[in-house]
Regions:
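N-proximal low-complexity "stem/linker" segments adjacent to membrane-targeting elements
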Residues: 1-31
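A short, conserved alpha-helix in the catalytic core of glycosyltransferases
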Residues: 162-167, 171-175, 182-216
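Non-catalytic, C-terminal membrane-associated alpha-helical segments of glycosyltransferases
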Residues: 235-238, 252-338
């Protein structure tokens, strides 16, 4: 297999934190190594787990194993990979995702335009059994996957899905990398670290864009613990809290742009669809309607709870975990001060 063109070389980064996912992590790495064209560099960043790092060094070939030197959590691990990347484009693949053939080629193709600062691919759930009957497709983001409401063709978006995304390495480093004040730590269902960085990237470079490329597809393993309705509610709650963090950092215009459309257009259409299905005798439609209303209400409650917790706090300038320097506040026409 030929490598990706040197002018657009690629470093693939997989971040892992537990040996419980060892077989999935190996599958993720293998899927990256067997892309055609292949990446010039594949990195496994281990998030503060010495036993996992030692095992990876013993058993893996063709992969550079690094231990995270950042704050514990996904953002710190991703920053470690970003700093170690030697290629112009850094691609992030989740440790429980497997890239399909053609994934890498499709993901980096938009970089032929200098205005492209990041790309993201489609993420498809791989269920341990049947798909959850009660889960509305508009809420597949709860299990880390693409959801109904996203574009079905190559389109400009605000931010990619973290399970399968790429960034121009130098620009991401210049922007200060991922903010370790947001994002997952272990099994914590927080998120939005890629959203916050994506907004900073485009705000710092007028005219820059991020593309969603559905053909760059990965399969995301859905673990058994994510099949519970309790997880669904918890994930929605923490999404609301995370959105409050992002809005504090970048303003509500940019921080809630996509969410407003999803709430005003996609969710009402989903409820109408399920209402018609219920009238047609689909008993599962009632469960999906209930989940839709519960999910939306929980996200909103989490968001306003997060905002209330932040009320009265001074907005301290964000400090880059990569350089220690103060990041400029993101306040532009796209993200006005509230």
């Amino acid at each position: 297999m030929a490598a990706v063109d040197d002018d657009l070389g690629v470093s693939v980064v997989v971040c892992a934190y537990t040996e419980k996912r060892w077989m999935l992590t190996r599958a993720a790495l293998d899927s990256a190594l067997h892309q055609s064209p292949r990446p010039q560099q594949v990195l496994l960043v281990v998030d503060h787990n010495a036993d996992l790092a030692a095992r990876a060094r013993r058993e893996l070939t063709g992969v550079t194993v690094l231990e995270s030197d950042g704050t514990p959590g996904l953002s710190g691990a991703r920053n470690t990979g970003l700093k170690a990347a030697t290629q112009p484009v850094t691609v992030f693949l989740d440790d429980d995702a497997e890239a399909r053939p053609g994934w890498l080629e499709s993901l980096v193709q938009p970089y032929s335009s200098p205005d492209v600062v990041a790309t993201g691919g489609s993420v498809h759930p791989r269920w341990p059994g049947r798909r959850l009957r009660w889960l509305p497709p508009e809420f597949d983001w709860v299990v880390g996957c693409s959801y109904r409401g996203l574009p079905e063709t190559v389109s400009v978006v605000r931010n990619p899905i973290g399970a399968s995304m790429s960034l121009r390495t130098s620009l991401a480093l210049e922007a200060g990398g991922f903010d370790d004040a947001v994002g997952r730590v272990g099994t914590s269902p927080r998120g939005c670290e890629e959203t916050e960085l994506a907004i900073r990237l485009t705000a710092s470079r007028p005219g820059s864009v991020i593309f969603y490329v559905p053909a760059a597809a990965v399969d995301h393993h859905v673990s058994a613990d994510r099949l519970r309705f309790g997880y669904f509610v918890s994930r929605c709650w923490h999404e609301g809290l995370s959105k409050a963090d992002v809005v504090r950092m970048v303003g509500s215009s940019a921080g809630l742009e996509r969410e407003r459309r999803h709430t005003a257009v996609v969710i009402p259409a989903a409820l109408m669809r399920e209402l018609r299905s219920l009238a047609g005798g689909d008993a599962g439609a009632g469960m999906r309607m209930a989940a839709t209303i519960t999910g939306l209400s929980t996200v909103v409650a989490g968001y306003f709870t997060g905002r209330a917790r932040l009320t009265g706090r001074s907005r301290k300038p964000s400090r880059s975990p990569l350089t220690g320097s103060i990041r400029p506040a993101v306040r532009s026409a796209a993200a006005p001060e509230e």
